[in-house]
Amino acid sequence: MKKVTKSTAKHSVNRRRFIKGAAAGAAGAAMLVGDQAVTAQTQSGNPDQSANISSEDGGANGNEGVGRSPKVDSFIVENPGSDYMVDVFRALDLEYCASNCGSSFDGLQESIVNHGNNQMPEFLTCLHEESSVAMAHGYAKIAGKPMMALFHGTVGLQHATMAIYNAYVDRVPVYMAVGLDYDGPVSAHNATDLAAIVRNFVKWDHQPNSLTDFGRAAMRAYTLATTPPMAPVLLVLDAAQQKAPLETAPSIPRLSLPKFPSADINSVKEIARLLVDADNPRINTGQAARTQEGIDLLVELAELLQLPVDGVNNRLNFPSRHPLQGTGTGVPDLILNLEPGARIGTTPSTPR
């Protein structure tokens, strides 16, 4: 990768200025072509056609602005609010944003590409919203941190629902955002309470009413998503906030990383005593061994006490080829469930 020095950056082409200049140049070229066409028609000896063009243009003396197209107001925002949003996402260490493009977040997409140079996050174009969430789902399980998925209005969020539910059931943090554009081209793609579509299977949702509120909400969403039990979160982003010019950007709030819950020392000592005194103990992992360190410690405990460990199929909590993997033999007289939902294969009448 080419290293960008100060001198290189100084002479680099700013993407937004280039696009702005190209648009202005294209408009000027179009006006020039129009003038040349009118001149050619006038020289060809067709005064009637020339007079019609002059009158349609509405010039005060019939000759001013002959042949020029009506002026179209350009919409250019130098510092949109979406630039601040990208800076916040970068502070959250969101590497990728998977999305099926939509008009309700074109401001944010433009800022990702031009303000953020398509890095942190990098915009990944997907053919379907369900694919976007599925990519973020798998990324979180491998990388150990959330990835962003971005949707367009009601239609995009509805397309994503099955994949969101899968992540919710699997307890995987997916950082999601959906665009809401009340003045957009299709009003049917909006809703008064857009997040209601998925509220029953996301951990938290919020629609910021200002950029300052967005900064706080973005940080809180990340903290809640990564706090066990982990789950997807959703932010509803108003298109007007994305595109509104910003004179002074709010400060980016600090991220408060969650601390994983753990048992107190007295409870740990009691569990150790019960395991040592038991004749045929067993451990049910559930989804508790979340990291490689957790797996290594669980293997060390199992080998120390020579007890079987019953993992689950949807997540690696214990090596599948380890001799102690499984339910063991006979009926256990003690079962240690590492989380409440880990009582697999047990009934109220089975041992404690």
Please annotate each region the language model reported:
Residues 2-11, 20-34, 39-352:
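N-terminal alpha/beta PP-like core and its mobile active-site loop of ThDP/TPP-dependent enzymes
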